[in-house]
């Protein structure tokens, strides 16, 4: 049995915490009755060891062991820095 590590891409929406950030993951879901695709957003708390991310950055994250009550994801890399 293979254990595939889950990786996702999202945009940083908050970086006010020390060594933590909130990443919004957007996905499209088809409505079961009408068939229209609806945008859904999931917010995940992510561990950022070096505080290298800012608001608006596009990041890649991966699932890990629970680090706190709400954090079980860690930063892999910054895909794109936000334009300030």
Curated annotation (Swiss-Prot):
InterPro entries: NA-bd_OB-fold, Ribosomal_uS17, Ribosomal_uS17_bact/chlr, Ribosomal_uS17_CS. One of its GO terms (biological process) is translation. The keyword rRNA-binding applies. Coiled coil: none annotated. Keywords: Ribonucleoprotein, Ribosomal protein, RNA-binding, rRNA-binding. It holds the Pfam family Ribosomal_S17. One of its GO terms (cellular component) is cytosolic small ribosomal subunit. One of its GO terms (molecular function) is structural constituent of ribosome. One of the primary rRNA binding proteins, it binds specifically to the 5'-end of 16S ribosomal RNA. Belongs to the universal ribosomal protein uS17 family. Part of the 30S ribosomal subunit. This is Small ribosomal subunit protein uS17. The gene is rpsQ.
